[in-house]
Amino acid sequence: MITVKGPVDHVVVVGAGLAGLAAALHLLGAGRRVTVVEREDVPGGRAGLLESGGFRIDTGPTVLTMPDLVEDAFAAVGERMADRLELIRLAPAYRARFADGSQLDVHTDGAAMEAAVEEFAGARQAVGYRRLRIWLERLYRVQMRRFIDTNFDSPLQLAHPDLARLAALGGFGRLDARIGHFVSDERLRRVFSFQALYAGVPPARALAAYAVIAYMDTVAGVYFPRGGMHALPRAMADAASDAGAVLRYGQRVTRLERSGDRVTAVVTDQEHIPCDAVVLTPDLPVSYRLLGRTPHRPLPLRHSPSAVILHTGTDRTWPDLAHHTISFGAAWKNTFHELTRTGRLMSDPSLLITRPTATDPSLAPPGKHLHYVLAPCPNTEVGPGVREWRELGPRYRDELLAELERREMPGLGAAIEEEGLVTPVDWTAQGHAAGTPFSVAHTFPQTGPFRPRNLVRGTVNAVLAGCGTTPGVGVPTVLISGKLAAERITGPRIARAPRSAPGGSSA
């Protein structure tokens, strides 16, 4: 593995999101001095917090899986996650609701899920689910250490017996077809393949290897931190500070000072911070601009679809909603065509509805509730641009409300006391390329050793972390990216065998 050469005693981490904080903790654990610079006044990055009218609203990811990766970050500085953060295991992990009126609670406990599938779709589908679960577990074991939790220096690193094992498992076939090999019910196929949407590839075209995301969601477990998702970066930042990190909030990095091929200082709008190495976690275009160079690629990068998010604080709730409810539209395949090809808004939307107060009522005033609705939309490269979204956003908000009232949440509009709307305008303003928080799509030419590297040619002591580089998009992979960035500076730490997520208290 290629590592940063020369002195690496003091490392500046740009960005106090999950990737930056994971990098900071692993660097501190290896004995480095660490300064973290964050433009916002609080840690979190994409996992931010909005407080309004007594509501505590998470502005970023709402799904937490693979908490063992969080545990690893705390363990790097000799701490236990449980001493900093309480995680609640959600049961069910999701509730899937379909256009035909049927619904399925998705359990991560194998026996409970098998029974639910049998009641939902019959004994044959339950047997298929059992086989699918075994396949997902094998897929995870083959991929995690060799293809996900690894720093690639060359595609030749793929030449390993695990590659043959992945091929034997059907990992290079198509995701939807492979899921269909186990369960033929169209609704079940959606439950185990919808995750590809956030990776930016339709299930019919995505590699079956991406079912590893379904493993994380439907086998390893879905969790929620007491206090909301923002409690996670807050706990990580506190642990980093207690371990000796200096955290500079409210400072925007304006440039990197260089001497030849080395970065010698990080310059903010308030101070000049000398460094031996730097970890950059902003979105790729921002990091490349700071470095003064963009790596050449044979083909332009393709980005994942974006999302419109509607945050609502309400005076009532809808008890049929689980903590996470996926409301599938009928036109599932057409949805992907609209999002990735024609650039149109979903004509029959599939939505993720999150009700965090179902698990932690303290996030809202007494008797009040929080609801978060994520509606995938085209990114600004293939769909409406920023200028169009300024006019389109309020109209689309009204369309979403009407659709939600027609489906799961009648009377929603009248129940809203606080709300916030996030569109590609906001993602663009935050520095996210193509107006999407989901960064570079996980097409085959943008995965593994072909994804933008965390080292940039021409700079010997700068390392990238975050969802745009390896291994990719999602909370677990972003945490891994921070660890991988740290290892580029410190060298590899003691390797661990892949583990399933630990248990936790159940919702």
UniProtKB/Swiss-Prot annotation:
Q: GO biological process annotations for this chain's record? A: carotenoid biosynthetic process
What does the entry list as the binding residues for FAD? 12-45
Q: Give the source's domain of life in one word.
A: Bacteria
Q: Has the keyword Flavoprotein been applied to this entry?
A: yes
An example molecular function term from Gene Ontology annotations: oxidoreductase activity, acting on the CH-CH group of donors
Q: What does the record give as cofactor?
A: FAD
The identity of this protein, by name, is Phytoene dehydrogenase
Q: What is the lineage of its organism?
A: Bacteria, Bacillati, Actinomycetota, Actinomycetes, Kitasatosporales
